[in-house]
Design a protein with these regions (language model features):
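Bacterial N-terminal signal peptides that target proteins for export
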Residues: 1-12
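N-terminal secretory/targeting leader peptides
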Residues: 10-13, 26-115, 123-229
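Sec/Tat signal peptide C-region and signal peptidase I cleavage site
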Residues: 19-25
Length: 229
């Protein structure tokens, strides 16, 4: 049975995250890339609780954390196909699939979290939502995933010049690859799950992500410098 869900989570920061659903069943499978200790994990668990509460228990949601159902691009495609019913997704890697997502994924486009909320609750957010709908995904809310900054194992990054020569992991989107390359670095698209080992073995020198992601999966153990950018 189809159930409508009201907007229960709101906006996001530089790294846009959303909750989507394409489900028509009583038992839903939900995807989340993050592990325990990340705010998105708590949000997805709360999402499952609210769905059960608002539907009087007629719909249950099982959240699979840690990306166990696949990488973000794979999970996004599974939501489109109905194999996964819901998930929280960063808009950066969605840009190659839904071009309108790039409108709000440009690096450093938002001045603050409040600015981001105003944009995403306005015409720009509506345009992205409409494009997602055309792709077979129903966005039901935006929320703050934290601003993305650089971290590495070589030294502090205080200016773009400090990125020169560094191999930096980025999301799979030409916008972020181009950002690092423009600073003189080497933007390297890579799945989030591969970053820890790649930092450990020197495959990459650094990465860019939000502070909760840096902390929750222990990237601080292999990258001693986090520079707010």
């Amino acid at each position: 049975m189809n159930k409508s869900i009201t907007k229960i989570l709101s906006s996001t920061a530089v790294a846009l995250t959303l909750i989507t659903t394409a489900a028509s069943a009583d038992s839903w499978r939900a995807w989340n890339i993050h592990t325990d200790g990340h705010p998105n994990t708590a949000a997805m668990d709360r999402f499952a609780e609210l769905v059960a509460e608002k539907t009087g228990g007629e719909v249950s949601v099982e959240v699979f954390h840690g990306g166990v159902l696949g990488s973000q691009p794979d999970a996004f495609e599974q939501v489109q196909l109905g194999a996964i019913d819901a998930g929280n997704f960063n808009l950066g890697p969605i840009g190659p699939i839904v071009k309108e997502a790039n409108l709000v994924s440009l690096p450093f486009i938002f001045r603050s979290v409040d600015h981001m909320f105003r944009v995403m609750d306005g015409p720009a957010g509506d345009k992205v939502s409409g494009a997602m709908g055309d792709a077979g995904i129903l966005p039901i809310g935006w929320f703050d995933a934290g601003a993305r900054s650089f971290y590495n194992n070589a030294g502090p990054i205080n200016s773009p010049a400090d990125v020169e020569g560094m191999k930096i992991r980025v999301m799979n989107n030409d916008l972020f690859t181009g950002m690092v390359n423009a600073m003189g670095g080497n933007g390297t698209p890579m799945a989030f799950s591969e970053v820890y080992s790649s930092l450990s073995t020197g495959v990459v020198d650094g990465a860019e992500n939000n502070l909760p992601s840096f902390q929750s999966v222990g990237h601080f153990e292999v990258a001693g410098y986090y520079s707010f950018s």
